[in-house]
């Protein structure tokens, strides 16, 4: 694919919603928009699998990764959803405010009535320019034989697009934060925003921090997972002591067992709950889950005095806390 230089096609009929997006007092809403787009992309891929038009890879686990780089002042949003071809990038990205979700729902409306596709990809995507001087997209479509696409724009009406190097189906969006928005290169600030907008999104969202020297943690070897990056294996011999028994005889007693541990690259932090209480029957919920839900939603360290959870015919549910 040859590198292409072009101009964004602005849909004048929808320019006012775009302007309103830029006028939001809460400029952190770009996080919600980009996460919503990633959820849409994953939902679409799963629907194609359900319709028999695509077969998900064995062991497929839908996920969204948010990676903060406080040195380079970048923020990445990565999903393993449907991805895009070059033609789709042209259609859904360079033509601002065109709704790819609407077109998709029209085609699959009989199969997706019970699902939520969240809005206009083009419009939500451009909220990224509320905080970034430049935005890059690297994407690979699920379609057989598709080539990876790289797209970048510096916030003007011009963009460059060419062949990318992504090898996994899905999309990676990189924001080069402007000077006024370096707060979003802080992992704690980004976690705060994710918890504000995305605590109950239906796809697992993982937050991590990119660093030249990787952050590490030590776990028990039995807790090692396939996707863990092992740095070092650590064996600790059992500790023993000489003690006197009831007969006055000395004997060797084990005071701590041998341990096999592993130093791994720190795992990304899961920041949302994909199985919120309102999606469960009251009989499936524990007392501690209700208390934790109350603390998380109402930001109150105290415990509620009591609560009522009614789960009637879909889509009605009711929570009441005191």
Placement of each model-derived feature along the sequence:
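GHKL/Bergerat-fold ATPase module in large chromosome/replication-associated machines
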Residues: 117, 135-158, 178-182, 188-322
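GHKL (Bergerat-fold) ATPase N-terminal catalytic module, capturing the glycine-rich phosphate-binding loop
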Residues: 1-179, 183-184, 192, 199, ...
């Amino acid at each position: 694919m040859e590198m292409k230089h072009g101009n964004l096609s602005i849909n004048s009929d929808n320019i006012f919603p775009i302007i309103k997006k830029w006028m939001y007092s809460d400029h952190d809403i770009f996080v919600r928009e980009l996460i919503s787009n990633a959820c849409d992309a994953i939902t679409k891929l799963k629907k194609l699998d359900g319709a028999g038009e695509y077969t998900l890879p064995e062991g497929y686990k839908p996920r969204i990764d948010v990676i903060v780089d406080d040195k380079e002042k970048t923020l990445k949003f990565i999903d393993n959803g449907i991805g895009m071809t070059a033609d789709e990038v042209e259609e859904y990205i360079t033509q601002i405010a065109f709704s790819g979700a609407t077109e998709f729902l029209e085609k699959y409306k009989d199969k997706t009535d019970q699902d939520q596709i969240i809005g206009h990809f083009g419009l939500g995507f451009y909220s990224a320019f509320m905080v970034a001087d430049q935005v890059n997209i690297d994407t690979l479509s699920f379609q057989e034989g598709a080539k990876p696409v790289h797209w970048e724009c510096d916030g003007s009406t011009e963009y460059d697009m060419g062949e990318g190097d992504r090898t996994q189906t899905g999309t990676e969006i990189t924001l080069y934060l402007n000077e006024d928005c370096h707060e979003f290169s802080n992992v704690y600030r980004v976690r705060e925003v994710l918890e504000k907008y995305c605590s109950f999104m239906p796809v697992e969202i993982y937050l991590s921090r990119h660093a030249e020297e990787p952050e590490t943690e030590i776990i028990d070897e039995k807790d090692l997972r396939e996707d863990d990056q092992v740095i070092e294996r650590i064996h600790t011999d059992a500790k023993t002591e000489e003690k006197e028994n009831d007969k006055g005889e000395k004997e060797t007693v084990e005071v701590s067992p041998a341990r096999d541990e592993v130093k791994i690259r720190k795992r990304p932090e899961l920041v949302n709950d994909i199985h919120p209480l309102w999606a469960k029957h009251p009989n499936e919920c524990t007392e501690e889950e209700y208390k934790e839900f109350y603390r998380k939603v109402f930001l109150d360290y105290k415990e509620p005095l009591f609560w009522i959870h009614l789960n009637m015919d879909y889509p009605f549910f009711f929570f009441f806390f005191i």
